[in-house]
A protein has these predicted regions:
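A structural signal for short loop-to-beta-strand junctions that line the ligand-binding cleft
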Residues: 76, 128-129, 136-137, 167-203, ...
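C-terminal capping/gating helix-and-loop segments adjacent to ligand/active sites or protein-protein/ligand interfaces
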Residues: 180, 401-408, 419-475
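Extracytoplasmic/periplasmic substrate-recognition and gating elements
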Residues: 326, 335-401
C-alpha cells in the first residue's frame, strides 16, 4: 500500500513530493500522498471524476454562542448572525472537519456561518469560477504564482487593515512578500510546512557519541567523523515514479537560499538569475560536495534509483545512513516501522544549518494564503480571524498543523516535529523561501529540473551541462 503523507507535506501547489491535504503529517501543508505537492505537480489523489466534483467540506452550523463557549477572544468582532462566508480550498477530509472544529467558537460567538468546500481540482476550478463571476468569498491558495494570476483578473481584494496589522505583527517580511503582488498586499499566510530538516536517530547518535551540529562546518566535520568510523553519513533517494528527481531540487533550493538569501533566490525563481549564473553554480557545487561525496554517501549513482521513501528508512536501527535531509513529513514514513519519533527516541530531526552568517535563519517550505473575492464586512471579519494568533493557536492545539504565526505559543504544539518546524518558521528573523521549483514554470520545476538533476546524480552529468539544459528549457513567454 503506498505511503500517504499526512496532511502537512512539503510541496504545496503542485504535484510533487508530498501530498496536499487529506491526511497530515508534520508539515503544515495538507496533502494526501507524498507525490502530491512538490507537491502538487507530482501525483494527484486517486479519485473518480464524480468524486472530484463532490469533494465538499463539512459545514459548521452553530450560529449562536452557548454557555460552554468563551466568547472573550472574539469580543472585537461584531455580531453578524445569519451571515455566511464561503471558502474554497484544495484541502480535503479529514483536515476539513478539523478546521471546522477549530473555527467553531468563532462561528458561535459571531453568528457567522463558514462553509468550506474542498476539491482536488481546486487549481483548475478556481480560475474558472473567478472568470465566471462565481468566485467564493475566500480561497486558500497554495501557490503564490496562482495568486498573482488571479490578481491580474482584478477580482482579488486588497487585504483589509486588520489583516495587514496581524501579518505585520505575527509574520516575517519574507512570508508577507509571498502574499504581495506588484507592491500591494492581498493574502495573509495560512498553514505552512517546512523542508529544512535533517533526520537522524538520537539513540544512535548517543551510542556513537555524536552531537547534533548547529553550523554547516560542524555538520561536515561530523560527516567526516562518521566516515572515519565506517558509517554512511548521508543518504538520499530521488526515486518517485513520474516525479523522480524532486528531492535533488530541494537540496539545491536549501543551499541557494542559505548561500545567497532572498534576493538571489527569488531572482533564480523568476529566471532573472539563470541556473548557469556563477552563484547558482557555486551552490550546486556545494550540494555536490555534500550529497555526491563518496566518503559520505557511498554509491552516488545509487541515489538516483533509490526511492525517497526507502532512503532513510533504516536510520532508527543504524543499519543504513546516519542522516537524511528531508521535510518534516518524513517522520511518518519512519514511524511506519514502529520507530518512536522524539528528541530522545529512534528518530528525530534537526535544523539544516545555515551556510552564510548574513542570511539569517534560512527556511525552505510552503503553505497556503487566504485571498478574498468579496469585501463584505463578514468576509473581512473571517479574514481577520484567520490571520490572527487566536485562530492559529486553536488549529495547532488540534495537532498535525503548523503555523508560521509567531503569536502561537510553542507549548500549543503536541507534535514535537511540528514544534521544531514552528520554531524556525515563526522566527521573526527567518529568511523564508517558498519552494523554488514549485514557483517555476511546470516545464522547468516539474520537468527539466527533475530530469537534469536525476542525470546529474545517476549519470554523472556535469553541472555546466545540467544548468545549460535547464536554462534552455525555460518557456520563452
Amino acid at each position: 500500500m503506498p505511503f500517504t503523507c499526512p496532511l502537512p507535506c512539503p510541496h504545496q501547489g503542485q504535484i510533487r513530493e508530498l501530498p496536499h491535504h487529506g491526511t497530515r503529517v508534520s508539515d503544515g501543508a495538507r496533502t494526501a500522498d507524498p507525490l502530491r505537492t512538490k507537491m502538487k505537480r507530482k501525483g494527484l489523489l486517486a479519485v473518480t471524476a464524480a468524486a472530484a466534483l463532490s469533494l465538499v467540506a463539512s459545514l459548521v452550523t452553530t450560529t449562536s454562542a452557548s454557555a460552554a463557549v468563551n466568547c472573550d477572544p472574539y469580543a472585537g468582532y461584531k455580531s453578524m448572525k445569519g451571515k455566511t462566508v464561503t471558502i474554497f480550498t484544495s484541502i480535503l477530509e479529514p483536515e476539513l472537519t478539523t478546521l471546522n472544529t477549530a473555527m467553531a467558537d468563532f462561528q458561535a460567538c459571531t453568528g457567522i456561518k463558514i462553509k468550506i468546500e474542498g476539491s482536488n481540482q481546486f487549481e483548475a476550478l478556481l480560475p474558472v469560477r473567478v472568470k465566471g463571476n462565481n468566485a467564493p468569498d475566500l480561497a486558500w491558495i497554495p501557490q503564490p504564482g496562482l495568486l498573482a494570476k488571479l490578481v491580474e483578473t482584478g477580482k482579488v481584494k486588497v487585504a483589509p487593515k486588520a489583516v495587514v496589522a496581524n501579518v505585520d505583527k505575527y509574520w516575517s517580511k519574507s512570508w508577507k512578500a509571498y502574499g504581495t503582488v506588484k507592491g500591494k498586499f492581498y493574502a495573509a499566510p495560512f498553514g505552512s510546512n517546512m523542508k529544512s530538516l535533517v533526520w537522524y536517530s538520537p539513540k544512535q547518535f548517543k551510542a556513537a557519541g555524536y552531537t547534533v551540529p548547529t553550523t554547516w562546518d560542524q555538520m561536515t566535520a561530523l560527516a567526516d567523523k562518521m566516515a572515519a568510523d565506517g558509517k554512511t553519513a548521508f543518504c538520499g533517494g530521488l526515486g518517485s515514479g513520474g516525479a523522480t528527481g524532486w528531492p535533488a531540487t530541494d537540496w539545491v533550493e536549501q543551499v541557494v537560499l542559505r548561500d545567497h538569501g532572498s534576493a538571489v533566490y527569488n531572482g533564480w525563481v523568476n529566471h532573472t538569475i539563470k541556473f548557469s549564473d556563477p552563484r547558482i553554480v557555486a551552490s550546486m557545487q556545494k550540494v555536490a560536495s555534500w550529497m555526491q561525496n563518496p566518503k559520505w554517501v557511498g554509491n552516488v549513482k545509487g541515489i538516483a534509483t533509490t526511492t525517497f521513501q526507502d532512503a532513510g528508512k533504516d536510520i532508527p536501527g543504524g543499519k543504513g545512513c546516519m542522516m537524511l535531509q528531508q521535510a518534516s513529513f518524513y517522520g511518518n514514513i519512519i514511524a511506519e516501522s514502529g520507530a518512536t519519533i522524539s528528541p530522545t527516541g529512534d528518530a528525530f530531526a534537526f535544523y539544516l544549518p545555515a551556510t552564510n552568517s548574513k542570511v539569517t535563519v534560512p527556511v525552505v517550505g510552503g503553505g497556503e494564503f487566504t485571498a478574498a473575492f468579496s469585501s463584505r464586512p463578514e468576509v473581512q471579519a473571517v479574514q481577520a480571524y484567520l490571520s490572527s494568533a487566536t485562530f492559529a493557536t486553536s488549529r495547532v492545539q488540534l495537532d498535525n498543523w503548523i503555523s508560521a504565526n509567531s503569536g502561537v505559543p510553542l507549548a500549543a504544539y503536541k507534535n514535537q516535529v511540528d514544534k521544531l518546524a514552528a520554531t524556525y518558521l515563526a522566527n521573526p528573523k527567518s529568511t523564508f523561501g517558498f519552494d523554488a521549483s514549485d514557483l517555476m514554470p511546470a516545464a522547468v520545476g516539474a520537468g527539466s529540473m527533475w530530469r537534469e538533476f536525476t542525470a546529474w546524480f545517476g549519470e554523472g552529468k556535469s553541472i555546466a551541462d545540467v544548468t545549460k539544459a535547464i536554462d534552455a528549457s525555460w518557456p520563452k513567454n
